[in-house]
């Protein structure tokens, strides 16, 4: 006779992942020696990288970005999405957020000539396609990178504000805000900051709402070129 056996499983006690600790580990092990050109490749080729990962079943993959090699746990493949990711494990999403945080810190600490170089080399496709450029401010521009929501304090709630704005405009399903709504804000848990930081979120949303969003297929370099002829896009 067929016997079906079932065993009890422990209750889900929640994730132990701490983005701050994860970033520190990433910074120590993978950021020394990394260049802006290598980071540029990661973001410019982001969609291509994700598409490639989604078609490969391997759980552990190494990305070679212009000589910068970083290991990735392939959660982009449908069959891997329920795999447990260690606290210090690197997914595409985590790497994106870590690099965004690194770029913001680097930008704010640099001289004006170095900032100009960064603005030239680092392009955020998700911001650019909405007509948002570095001119909107580094915190805003870099907040469009996936994973920036892990650092709501560093990015002054802009990742959340961008998500709220997209939902209000019917450009994004509200369910995609769930991950952001679980994040901490400068060490404050979500249950607390959602009641004590409403003013800060509203201020961030006001900034984001006033950015003059517009869909465009023209790059920032092309817009700058055309502006020399009095053409604004």
Swiss-Prot record:
Main location: virion
GO BP term, example: symbiont-mediated suppression of host gene expression
Record Pfam families: Bunya_nucleocap
Coiled coil: none
Signal peptide boundaries: none
Annotated RNA binding sites: 15, 18, 47, 50, 75, 81, 94, 123, 125, 128, 166, 182-184, 217
MF (Gene Ontology): RNA binding
Cellular compartments per GO CC: helical viral capsid; ribonucleoprotein complex; viral nucleocapsid
Task of the protein: Encapsidates the genome protecting it from nucleases. The encapsidated genomic RNA is termed the nucleocapsid (NC) and serves as template for transcription and replication. The NC have a helical organization. Seems to participate in the nuclear relocalization of host PABP1, thereby inhibiting host cellular translation.
Written domain comment of the UniProt record: The N-terminus and C-terminus are involved in homooligomerization and play an essential role in viral RNA synthesis.
Protein name: Nucleoprotein
Record lineage: Viruses, Riboviria, Orthornavirae, Negarnaviricota, Polyploviricotina
Underlying gene: N
